[in-house]
């Protein structure tokens, strides 16, 4: 799709109108935060994070690279600049001004690169409301996937095919997994 200057000018005006005070060129420069990631060892993990992406990590079971994380189970360390050596979780607590108008007590992102050499388990992720009430006040787990590489004929499981709660229960209790699970 071709963009023309008129379209770009329109969208620039719209962005500035809606959030201009936070995007103005007159704001003081804020450095880009480069981070040292957190790695996890998982039974389904592999070696691609080291062999194909150049991370210097040991083990043949590296499942996840947490590239942006301020999570209780692992937080990135700032790699350089004014905050070098500081944990992202500490920066979030002590310097909220660096993160714009983000609301909430919990750092809202967990960005991962996953190397799954074996099938992953099917998981059910809560929304924010359920997680706040039942998961010690944490955020829900909304996901977005960007697949860097996969084997031919790979599939993703996204949701299920049950139309009602009763149908879901019936499919689970009777082991009708191939009918229940939605693969793409």
Outline where the language-model segments fall:
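Residues that form generic nucleotide/phosphate-binding pockets
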Residues: 15, 91, 95, 171, ...
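Conserved, mostly hydrophobic/aromatic
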Residues: 1, 12
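Transition-metal
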Residues: 24-159, 163
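Catalytic-face loop-and-helix region of soluble metabolic enzyme cores
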Residues: 14-21
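C-terminal beta-signal and terminal closure region of outer-membrane beta-barrel proteins
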Residues: 4-5
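Active-site glycine-rich loop that binds ribose-phosphate moieties when present
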Residues: 164-184
């Amino acid at each position: 799709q071709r963009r023309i200057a008129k379209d770009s000018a329109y969208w620039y005006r719209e962005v500035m109108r809606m959030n201009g005070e936070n995007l103005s060129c007159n704001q003081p420069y804020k450095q880009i935060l480069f981070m040292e990631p957190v790695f996890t060892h998982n039974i389904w993990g592999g070696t691609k994070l080291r062999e194909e992406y150049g991370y210097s990590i040991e083990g043949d079971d590296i499942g996840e690279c947490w590239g942006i994380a301020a999570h209780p189970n692992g937080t990135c360390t700032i790699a350089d600049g004014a905050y070098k050596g500081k944990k992202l979780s500490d920066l979030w607590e002590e310097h909220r001004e660096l993160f714009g108008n983000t609301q909430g007590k919990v750092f809202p992102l967990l960005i991962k690169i996953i190397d799954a050499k074996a099938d992953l388990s099917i998981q059910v992720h809560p929304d924010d409301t359920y997680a706040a009430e039942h998961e010690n006040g944490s955020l829900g787990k909304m996901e977005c996937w960007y697949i860097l590489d996969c084997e031919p004929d790979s599939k993703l499981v996204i949701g299920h095919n049950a139309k009602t709660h009763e149908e879901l229960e019936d499919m689970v209790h009777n082991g009708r997994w191939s009918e229940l699970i939605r693969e793409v």
